[in-house]
């Protein structure tokens, strides 16, 4: 019960934050939300979570979940994108992680005038809710997102908290391998989404 109340207060706080701070300029509704290019795996996953995947034109290579993403055009790696590759898909809206780059490409996209939103990230339960709320606000489905968060996400976060508080939970040393480059593993470093996932 305590955790449910905590999450409710958290959700209300996030929504008030979106309305009253500088996040508004990033999270306010876009003029055209039908043709989206995504640079960042978590954003792609959120759009699928919200059942809004039909809006997606293309994705970056970190967007590998769910498996249906393999059918979408790729724009390359989130940190080493090209403006030409992105703009060739004729997007009306680009949603990117805060490590989207390089900076020159972001500047080139802004010069063309395509609506680009770089969404900040915090690797916590609050950060997940805040990110979903922001993306939902951009594409104009806040009410739908609230229901999804309440019905689908909250129970999972509650179960996670229950497990962390249980006696069987023990911290272990782990490493998250994102992919293999030849024989060398690409691992999640400090400050990445992967590292945040491990900590949670």
For each of these PLM feature ranges, what is it?
Residues 37, 56-57, 73, 169-177, ...:
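Mobile, glycine- and charge-enriched loop segments
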Residues 34-105, 117:
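A short, structured surface patch at a secondary-structure boundary
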Residues 5-16:
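Bacterial N-terminal signal peptides
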Residues 1-2:
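N-terminal secretory signal peptides that target proteins for export/translocation
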Residues 62-65, 149, 185-200:
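Alpha-helical, coiled-coil/dimerization segments enriched in small aliphatic residues
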Residues 26-35, 104-186:
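Extracytoplasmic substrate-binding proteins
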Residues 19-21:
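Boundary at the C-terminal end of the N-terminal hydrophobic targeting segment
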Residues 85, 108, 197:
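Hydrophobic/aromatic ligand-binding patch that stacks against planar heteroaromatic rings
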């Amino acid at each position: 019960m305590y955790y449910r109340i905590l999450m409710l207060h958290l959700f209300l706080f996030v929504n008030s934050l979106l309305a009253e701070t500088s996040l508004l300029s990033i999270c306010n509704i876009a003029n055209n939300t039908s043709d989206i290019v995504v640079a960042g795996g978590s954003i792609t996953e959120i759009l699928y979570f919200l059942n809004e995947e039909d809006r997606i034109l293309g994705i970056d290579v970190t967007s590998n979940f769910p498996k249906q993403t393999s059918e979408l055009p790729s724009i390359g790696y989130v940190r080493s994108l090209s403006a030409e590759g992105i703009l060739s898909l004729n997007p009306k809206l680009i949603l990117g992680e805060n490590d989207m780059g390089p900076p020159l490409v972001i500047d080139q996209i802004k010069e063309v005038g395509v609506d680009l939103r770089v969404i900040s990230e915090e690797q916590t339960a609050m950060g997940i809710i805040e990110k979903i709320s922001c993306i939902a606000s951009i594409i104009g489905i806040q009410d739908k997102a609230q229901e999804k968060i309440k019905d689908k996400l909250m129970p999972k976060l509650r179960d996670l908290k229950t497990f962390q508080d249980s006696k069987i939970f023990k911290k272990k040393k782990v490493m998250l391998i994102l992919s293999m480059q030849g024989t060398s593993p690409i691992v999640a470093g400090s400050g990445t989404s992967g590292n945040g996932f491990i900590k949670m």
